[in-house]
């Protein structure tokens, strides 16, 4: 390594001890190997070589600790110093030679200049607008060949390797995802799926039809949403079929959300009249999908967890932590008119719609239409349902945003009366929940304490249950008894009479005072 020395600095003296000479000789060898200087230039005995000895000693000292200086940085920084301090042309020529020699091995062994390539699903996951369509196989074996799957128009996604592809849009804006789908299943079970519906066309292998049921979520502009499903509807009357498929534009628009997707909401069904257990409890599930989509219903496993962790929750399959639910129990389907269907895919414990089984064990069922408010049950209790993992799943179905309550004049007036009550009691009009700091709006579950403070019930529920029946207001710290008995009707009548009597006394006192004032003035 070459380090320039200013002109006003005295040149270093020759070494006077054997220790110094030994260290300098060792440092020369290290300098030759580290900086890449030609040994022939070192043997020329120029003064620049002698000036480089102190710097080479520093480099040898650093090499003893495993620290290697960057020769390219030192050489690039040495050139300006040479121009500043007026070094000789020979020294400047040496610095150029050092740079050229140092850059040569770097070109032979280039460093990694590009970041680590993430899977395609991980790249899209960081964006808020997730790209559709999505295809996931919950039972296919794991593959690691990302490049092979990305060559297709619509990649086959496996557990642990979820690959999504962008919608190939033509210049006119249409979606070009209705081409053939090549599944990533093993070669022994190769399938040709036309139109994007899994299991629609299978050549000479009907038993493998739904063995690898795929979870398909299409975008809102998916054409031919009803045709690609290949629905196998039960025998119904002509009037029912016309009402199902002939939907006006106003109704169709109401079924879609702001992104043009249809939705389904599943909530636990609790039957208070039942003497047995109430089934598996789960949080409300909301899924959104475009026309022609197919949502898999199955069991939650580690493979499923790895697959769904890479996509947003609203596009997840419907999975439950219950062993009475098969790995691929069934599927939901939605057509272009927003009609939803349920299909049992050879489940062992069965699927029950409004307490009626769709198909026998290990057999396919028809695509049964769903209606808002239907009760769906997956499986039957095993071992009496004593353990939660062996309980069936009962749920209520709500379709296409029907659970969204619309605020009417009555709801708005009730909220306004509540706000006026708070203003009269506390003197301050509170519009926000003091726990979540969100506004209290109509059609929301609200808890009102005796001190006239209010919160969202889901926000204050833990405080209510913590010391029930006693409740301490988190706003004013007043305590009350939530189990206090109501006043009887007789006591209410007496209180009303007393209040009316007090009002009459007040009015009489006011009249007497006014009469005295009139008499005092002539």
From Swiss-Prot:
An annotated GO BP: protein ubiquitination
Annotated compartments: Cytoplasm
Domain annotation FHA: ranges: 295-358
Enzyme class: transferase
Modified residues (Phosphoserine): 206
EC numbers: 2.3.2.27
Cross-link (Glycyl lysine isopeptide (Lys-Gly) (interchain with G-Cter in ubiquitin)), chain numbering: 211, 256, 258, 288, 310, 333, 343, 346, 366, 406, 412, 423
Gene Ontology CC terms: cell division site; cytosol; ubiquitin ligase complex
UniProt feature, compositional bias: Polar residues: 36-49
InterPro entries on file: Dma1/Dma2_RING-H2, FHA_dom, SMAD_FHA_dom_sf, Znf_RING, Znf_RING/FYVE/PHD
Region (Disordered) residue spans: 1-56, 69-92
This protein's UniProt keywords: Cell cycle, Cell division, Cytoplasm, Isopeptide bond, Metal-binding, Mitosis, Phosphoprotein, Transferase, Ubl conjugation, Ubl conjugation pathway, Zinc, Zinc-finger
Low complexity bias (residue ranges): 14-35
Keyword Hydrolase in record: no
Source organism, top-level taxon: Eukaryota
Post-translational modification: UBC4-dependent autoubiquitination occurs at Lys-211, Lys-258, Lys-288, Lys-310, Lys-333, Lys-343, Lys-346, Lys-366, Lys-406, Lys-412 and Lys-423. UBC13/MMS2-dependent autoubiquitination occurs at Lys-258, Lys-310, Lys-346 and Lys-366. Lys-211, Lys-256, Lys-288, Lys-310, Lys-343, Lys-258, Lys-366 and Lys-412 are also ubiquitinated in trans by DMA1 E3 ligase in association with UBC4.
GO molecular function, one term: ubiquitin protein ligase activity
Main location: cytoplasm
Keyword Lipid biosynthesis: no
Reaction(s) catalysed (UniProt annotation): S-ubiquitinyl-[E2 ubiquitin-conjugating enzyme]-L-cysteine + [acceptor protein]-L-lysine = [E2 ubiquitin-conjugating enzyme]-L-cysteine + N(6)-ubiquitinyl-[acceptor protein]-L-lysine
Zn-finger region bounds: RING-type: 433-477
Summary of the function given for this chain in its UniProt record: E3 ubiquitin-protein ligase which functions in cell cycle retarding in conjunction with the UBC4 and UBC13/MMS2 complex, 2 E2 ubiquitin conjugating enzymes. Involved in nutritional control of the cell cycle. Required for proper spindle positioning, likely regulating septin ring deposition at the bud neck.
PANTHER family: E3 UBIQUITIN-PROTEIN LIGASE DMA1-RELATED, E3 UBIQUITIN-PROTEIN LIGASE RNF8
Family to which the UniProt record says this protein belongs: Belongs to the DMA1 family.
Protein name in UniProt: E3 ubiquitin-protein ligase DMA2
Organism field: Saccharomyces cerevisiae (strain YJM789) (Baker's yeast)
């Amino acid at each position: 390594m070459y380090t320039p020395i200013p002109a006003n600095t005295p040149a270093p003296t020759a070494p006077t001890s054997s220790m110094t000479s030994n260290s300098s000789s060792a440092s020369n060898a290290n300098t030759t190997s580290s900086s890449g200087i030609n040994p022939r230039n070192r043997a020329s005995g120029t003064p620049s070589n002698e000036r480089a000895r102190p710097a080479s000693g520093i480099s040898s000292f650093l090499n003893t600790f495993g620290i290697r200086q960057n020769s390219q940085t030192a050489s690039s920084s040495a050139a300006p110093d040479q121009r500043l301090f007026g070094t000789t042309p020979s020294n400047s020529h040496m610095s150029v030679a050092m740079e050229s020699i140092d850059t040569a091995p770097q070109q032979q062994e280039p460093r990694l200049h590009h970041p680590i390539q993430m899977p395609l699903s991980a790249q899209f996951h960081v964006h808020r607008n997730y790209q559709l369509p999505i295809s996931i196989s919950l039972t296919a074996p794991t593959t690691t060949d990302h490049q092979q799957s990305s060559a297709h128009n619509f990649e086959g996604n496996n557990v642990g390797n979820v690959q999504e592809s962008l919608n190939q849009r033509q210049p006119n804006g249409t979606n070009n995802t209705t081409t053939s789908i090549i599944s990533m299943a093993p070669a022994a079970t190769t399938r040709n799926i036309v139109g994007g519906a899994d299991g629609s066309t299978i050549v000479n292998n009907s038993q493998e039809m739904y063995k690898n049921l795929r979870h398909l979520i299409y975008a809102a502009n998916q054409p031919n949403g009803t045709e690609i499903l290949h629905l196998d509807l039960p025998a119904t009357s002509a009037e029912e079929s016309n009402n199902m498929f002939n939907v006006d534009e106003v109704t169709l628009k109401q079924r879609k959300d702001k992104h043009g997707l249809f939705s389904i909401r599943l909530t636990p069904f609790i039957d208070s009249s039942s003497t047995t257990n109430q089934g598996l409890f789960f949080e409300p599930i909301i899924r959104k999908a475009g026309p022609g989509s197919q949502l898999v219903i199955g069991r939650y496993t580690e493979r499923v967890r790895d697959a769904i962790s890479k996509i947003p929750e609203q596009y997840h399959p419907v999975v439950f932590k219950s062993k009475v639910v098969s790995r691929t129990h069934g599927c939901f389907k939605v057509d272009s008119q927003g009609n939803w269907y349920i299909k049992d895919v050879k489940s062992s414990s069965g699927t029950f719609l409004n307490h009626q089984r769709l198909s026998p064990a290990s057999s396919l069922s028809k695509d049964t239409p769903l209606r808002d408010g239907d009760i769906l049950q997956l499986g039957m209790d095993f071992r009496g349902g004593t353990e939660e993992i062996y309980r069936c799943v009962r749920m209520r179905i709500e379709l296409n945003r029907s659970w969204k309550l619309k605020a009417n004049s009555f709801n708005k007036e009730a909220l306004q009366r509540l706000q006026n009550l708070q203003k009269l009691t506390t003197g301050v009009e509170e519009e926000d929940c003091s726990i979540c700091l969100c506004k209290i709006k109509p059609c929301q579950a609200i808890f009102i304490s005796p001190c006239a403070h209010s919160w969202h019930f889901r926000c204050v529920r833990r405080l209510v249950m913590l010391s029930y029946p006693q409740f301490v207001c988190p706003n004013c710290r007043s305590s009350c008894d939530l189990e206090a008995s109501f006043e009887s009707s007789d006591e209410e009548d007496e209180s009303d009479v007393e209040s009316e009597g007090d009002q009459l006394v007040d009015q009489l006192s006011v009249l007497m005072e006014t009469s005295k004032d009139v008499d005092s003035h002539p």
